[in-house]
Design a protein with these regions (language model features):
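Catalytic domains of carbohydrate-active enzymes, especially glycoside hydrolases
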Residues: 56-72
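Hydrophobic "anchor" residues on beta-strands that sit immediately upstream
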Residues: 32, 66, 106, 126, ...
């Protein structure tokens, strides 16, 4: 008896991202390595506050195959308070400058701070990764004034309160509608849509059930005609599924990353770069075969 034909896999609506004069080709998914310049991030807070330590870790992630390095100076873990603007700038810019001078990979700045957005381009950044999707005052104007790529993420509430019993009537419908609205807002501000990617915001104002519902139907977000970014690494909902502490969630994180790529994700944000690169390469190969 002949084997049944494989079910077609989702195809993301865009396979490239414009980032400050460079083009990120996304025919296959790539890995974005995480570099937190914070004292209180849930997984690696305090490890890379020294610029030399941050650069060494950036070099290691580049060697392991990261295509993008995401540098952040404000913790957005559940319950985190907002960072002081000037403090965030002082943490991030020296590291961006050092990395830009030493490494050829794309540099993302994880921020909602419009002043940091403006200054990051001059420091050598290529991409803004904003958990607030340019909703902060003056953020969309700051982004429109430059030419950096922009990742628009969905978050219900703020980090300080986002996990206090988040509720949705239909989480997939609401997340998709929010991201569509933010893409339209960027277009209205004069931002080229080819500079945009979108992120459904796993773990940001969502219960484990919400996260699983989004993952089951991720292909419906991947049809927004912009590249899809996902952040799944070491998240608390991995702990809810596995019972593992933050430093022991690699296997669960890799399983989710693989599923995400098969369902249309093009950028996978990760702390454990080497292992995630391997998982993404396997998932990319599976996508090619099944198409």
């Amino acid at each position: 008896m002949a084997a049944p034909a494989p079910r077609p896999l989702p195809v993301a609506g865009a396979a490239r991202l414009l980032c400050a004069g460079r083009v990120l080709e996304l025919e296959g998914a790539v890995v974005m390595g995480v570099l937190n310049i914070t004292p209180d991030s849930f997984s690696d807070g305090g490890l890379y506050l020294d610029p030399a330590a941050a650069l060494a870790h950036a070099e290691a992630m580049a060697e392991q195959g990261a295509a993008i390095l995401d540098i952040g100076g404000e913790s957005t873990r559940p319950g985190a308070a907002a960072a002081d603007s000037e403090q965030e700038i002082r943490r991030v810019l020296p590291v961006v400058e050092r990395v830009a001078a030493r490494l050829p990979l794309l540099i993302s700045v994880d921020t909602s701070n419009p002043e940091l957005m403006r200054r990051a381009a001059d420091a050598g950044a290529h991409l803004i990764n904003d958990v607030r999707a340019l909703r902060s005052p003056k953020a969309i104007e700051a982004a429109a004034a430059g030419n950096l790529g922009i990742c628009l993420m969905h978050m219900r509430g703020e980090p300080a309160d986002m996990q206090r019993e988040p509720q949705y009537a239909q989480v997939l419908v609401e997340v998709r509608a929010y991201l569509e609205e933010r893409v339209r807002a960027c277009a209205a501000a004069g931002i080229d849509p080819q500079r945009l990617c979108v992120d459904p915001g796993f773990g940001f104002g969502k219960t484990t059930a919400h996260n699983l519902e989004l993952m089951r139907h991720l292909e419906d977000v991947a049809t927004l005609e912009r590249p899809l970014c996902v952040g799944l690494s070491r998240k608390s909902f991995v702990a809810a599924l596995t019972g593992r502490a933050a430093g022991e969630r690699l296997a669960g994180s890799l399983a989710l990353a693989t599923v995400a790529v098969l369902r249309g994700a093009r950028i996978v944000r990760a702390h454990d770069v080497a292992a995630t690169v391997d998982a993404v390469r396997v998932a990319n190969a599976m996508r090619r075969e099944l198409h």
